Structures are given as C-alpha cells and as structure tokens.
Amino acid sequence: YLGVNGVLLPAKVQQIIPSEKAQVVALLASAAMIAATLANIVIGGFSDITRSRFGRRTPWIIAGSVGSLLTLLWFNMAGTVTMMVVAWCSYQICLNAIVAPLLAFLQDQVAPKNRGTISSIYAFGYVIGQYGGQVVGAQFLSHVGTGIVVMAFLTLLSGPLAAIIVREPSSLGMPKKHFTMGMV
C-alpha cells in the first residue's frame, strides 16, 4: 500500500498537475481517509453476515484483491484530478475489503490466549510490507505507470495467497444474520 500511497501517488500527481502537487496529494489523502474509514466499517459488517462455502471473510478478501487491481489500473490511467480522486477512493474501498475481513478473521480463528502473538506477527508483517512496498515503489520512480501496474498485481496476489494459507472453513451452516446499523 505505501509503495503506491507514499511513493508512486505523489509521482503520478507530479506528472498530471505539478503546480498543485501538494494540494492534490492532500485532497487525495483526505478523500481516501474518509472512503477507507467508511469502507472498513461497512465491509467488516457485511463480512460478519456473509455465508459461503469459502467462509465469511474469504470472498471479501478475494473480491477486494480483484477490485484493488482494477481500481489501481484505473488510477494509473487517470488524466484529471477528478478521475484520480474517484479512482483512488475506489481503491481504498477495495483495499479495505481485504483489510477489514482479514483482521476479523484473526479474531474468528485464533484462540484468545494466542491473539497477542498473532497480532504481533501481523504487525511485524505489516511493517515489513509497508516499508518493503516503499522500497519496491521507489524502484519505479522513473516509470511511475509501470510501478503502479506492478503494485496492482502484487495486491491482486495478496488475497488468493491469504485464502490459500488460511483456508477458512465454510460458513454455510452458521445462523443467518441481517445487516443492521447496530453492526456499525
């Protein structure tokens, strides 16, 4: 995420509208924060009530991975600030379709006595991924579009890889629930 967000996004803005780079990056960050926050809450709630043979979380993680690929490719093609904002916010929604269910999965599948350890492992992996993503992103500063495409495909791989490693059990036998505002 930070490979695109912290490195390639500002470089892309520089290509489109260099005279207003700081303002546009701030606009993108602000809009993305709102989209990500709302998406995390809503998608987390919907993943709680999802019933499928692949489990509650896995379908959202896979859909988020595919959506992240598509929205990053859309962002890469953006030629205006408006298109960048819409594509970037769409990416945040898709990215949170990976993050929210993944975090909920940890709560679902890990025994309470092991949650501290698993949370530490998750945090360690998160930090490595964030800084590693910036290192990878920086390799593409002279070819920003290529870098965004590479990062989009890396994000696409993340969901199926997580699903293969985790193997969430079916949720078809769980009692059905309906989405309510209380879930938010």
PLM-predicted stretches and their roles:
Residues 25-47:
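Central cavity-lining transmembrane alpha-helices of secondary-active solute carriers
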Residues 62-79:
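C-terminal ends and interior cores of transmembrane alpha-helices
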Residues 1-33:
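Helix-loop boundary and gating motifs at the non-cytosolic
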Residues 169-184:
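Juxtamembrane intracellular "pre-TM" segments in multi-pass secondary transporters
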